[in-house]
């Protein structure tokens, strides 16, 4: 149970933040409307969507944010794609087969074209998989493809691109050879890291291919406009292989970093949806905007990463002390109140073919006992009233971190730690995390594919920039390597759980809570199906005509 005094202390710590948030909301209420809404052509269906942040790039091999993926996934389709439920279904590959040892995968491509009419071929995939792994591409996601034979060597410049385990057997047959069995490959194949890019266009214009006007798609939409700070406009691709099944003709995706303003824009009918909701507003919105709030269990975790290059965080006792002294129940139940669950493990519940490792023993202790143990560990490490531990926490300025980070700061003050909060826009924050320019980082991770490895690989030595804290443990790496080599799903899961348990004890990260996905969607939008990976391809959307109280997005004919 959370004591009243505990709540009072945390709310006092949150005071300034809440005052500022209230002021921001008040200003939003009186502010002028967002960017003007372009007209929808007669007879067409148009959707206006809030997309949280401004994309940095629409190059699938260089993007890192979910706000970019929400655009790219509607432009480019890999060997597989997501259905309405977020599950892997055939994409460019109509079917595939694997060798008996699980190492060689053969994909048979459908007849499909780029938006300029040029056929999509196996050579496009060979070119693309080589491109993302080339050192000069500097893809921060490259390590997710290290399961492909020689991928790591190519990415590190130790082998030529031709050594990569991919080849075009014919224009419509692609072969991928892996280092180890990977039953999750069809899930991974829908991720933007495995998206094809048009080789014939890059041969002609190079890196300018990604600009609107040059960009070629093989998916349901093409990008026609990108007005910085305003919107990205997607238009239905008439050459998409299932264009006749795509209902929405145009989509405008707006950066909506101000969640309060985005909420009001949805309420006013300026936006048909927004890809986030302030957690502590969910109950209110369910009452005031019935049918709009969409929440669902989500394969995602919010956590803190400790920079192992900072002297204080080289000491396991310091990391453990900080991890155990956070009151996660207060954060999820009193602050966020959006259905999030306190996290004491790193892999979320619901991941396929996996049972999470047992949480640390302290997870079941009362907060007061955890605080006492944390003070003892800090004292052993040389910190106390005469030598307090001091550091900065860099965090995102998105709605939820703005709520819970002051509470964590207050938790650590209770054990004698002086932590200073430094907030940044999400893109800037993550750039700092990837360059390891932080002491403690507030981060979040969403599964790229439904498998425990999508989470556990983050702390692997070879992972690179996404291993924010630069954690390195040979024993952890060895357990993941054993899991990679294992064909038996149950034995593999056991190795993964051992690795997770080892990592939790080492505490290079402190899990805070498991996500729920939160979308604000007009009831008139159909085909938007809540799912565990929060993937919503626009090819399945439509607009129900005559929805009560809804803005009419379907322009009249004539």
Predicted regions and their residues:
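Extracytoplasmic/peripheral linker and loop segments enriched in polar/acidic and small residues
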Residues: 31, 166-167, 332, 367, ...
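Aromatic- and charge-enriched surface segment that lines or borders ligand/interaction sites
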Residues: 94-142, 175, 265, 312-314
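Gly/Pro-rich hinge or "lid" segments in bacterial periplasmic/extracellular proteins
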Residues: 157-163, 167, 172, 180-246, ...
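Structural transition elements
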Residues: 342-380, 398-403
């Amino acid at each position: 149970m959370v004591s009243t005094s505990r709540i009072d202390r945390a709310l006092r710590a949150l005071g300034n933040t809440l005052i500022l948030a209230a002021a921001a909301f008040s200003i939003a209420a009186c502010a002028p409307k967002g960017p003007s809404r372009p007209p929808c052509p007669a007879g067409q269906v148009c959707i206006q969507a809030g997309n949280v942040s401004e994309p940095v790039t629409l190059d699938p091999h260089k993007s890192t944010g979910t706000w970019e993926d929400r655009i790219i996934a509607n432009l480019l389709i890999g060997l597989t794609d997501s259905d309405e439920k977020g599950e892997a279904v055939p994409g460019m590959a109509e079917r595939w087969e694997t060798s008996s040892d699980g190492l060689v995968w053969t994909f048979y491509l459908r007849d499909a074209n780029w938006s300029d009419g040029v056929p999509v071929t196996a050579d496009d995939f060979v070119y693309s998989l080589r491109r993302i792994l080339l050192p000069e591409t500097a893809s921060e996601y490259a390590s997710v493809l290290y399961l492909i034979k020689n991928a790591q060597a190519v990415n590190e410049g130790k082998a030529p691109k031709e050594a990569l385990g991919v080849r075009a057997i014919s224009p419509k047959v692609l072969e991928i050879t892996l280092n180890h069995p990977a039953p999750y490959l069809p899930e991974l194949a829908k991720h933007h890291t495995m998206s094809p890019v048009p080789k014939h266009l890059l041969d002609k214009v190079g890196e300018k291919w990604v600009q609107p006007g040059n960009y070629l798609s093989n998916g349901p939409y093409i990008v026609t406009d990108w007005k910085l700070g305003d919107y990205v406009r997607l238009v239905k691709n008439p050459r998409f292989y299932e264009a006749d099944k795509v209902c929405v003709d145009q989509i405008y995706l707006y950066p909506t970093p101000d969640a309060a303003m985005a909420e009001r824009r949805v309420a006013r009918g300026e936006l048909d949806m927004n890809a986030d909701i302030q957690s502590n507003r969910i109950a209110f919105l369910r009452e005031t905007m019935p049918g709009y709030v969409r929440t669902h269990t989500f394969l995602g975790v919010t956590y803190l990463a400790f920079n192992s290059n900072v002297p204080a965080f080289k000491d396991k006792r310091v990391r453990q002390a900080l991890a155990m002294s956070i009151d996660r129940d207060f954060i999820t139940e009193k602050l966020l109140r959006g259905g999030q669950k306190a996290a004491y493990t790193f892999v979320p519940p619901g991941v396929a073919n996996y049972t999470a490792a047992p949480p640390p023993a302290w997870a079941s202790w009362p907060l007061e006992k955890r605080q006492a143990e944390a003070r003892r560990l800090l004292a052993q490490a040389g910190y106390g009233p005469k030598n307090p531990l001091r550091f900065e926490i860099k965090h995102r300025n998105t709605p939820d971190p703005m709520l819970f980070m002051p509470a964590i700061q207050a938790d650590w003050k209770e054990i004698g730690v002086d932590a200073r909060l430094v907030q940044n826009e999400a893109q800037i924050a993550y750039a700092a995390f990837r360059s390891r320019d932080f002491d403690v980082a507030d981060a979040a991770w969403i599964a790229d594919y439904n498998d425990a490895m999508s989470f556990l690989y983050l702390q692997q030595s070879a992972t690179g920039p996404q291993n924010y804290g630069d954690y390195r443990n040979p024993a952890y790496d060895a357990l993941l390597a054993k899991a990679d080599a294992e064909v038996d799903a149950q034995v593999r899961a056991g190795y993964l759980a051992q690795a997770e348990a080892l990592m939790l004890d080492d505490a290079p990260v402190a899990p805070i809570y498991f996500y729920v996905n939160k979308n604000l969607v007009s009831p008139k939008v159909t085909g938007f199906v809540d799912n565990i990976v929060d993937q919503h391809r626009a090819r399945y959307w439509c607009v129900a005509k005559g929805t009560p109280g809804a803005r009419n997005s379907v322009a009249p004919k004539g």
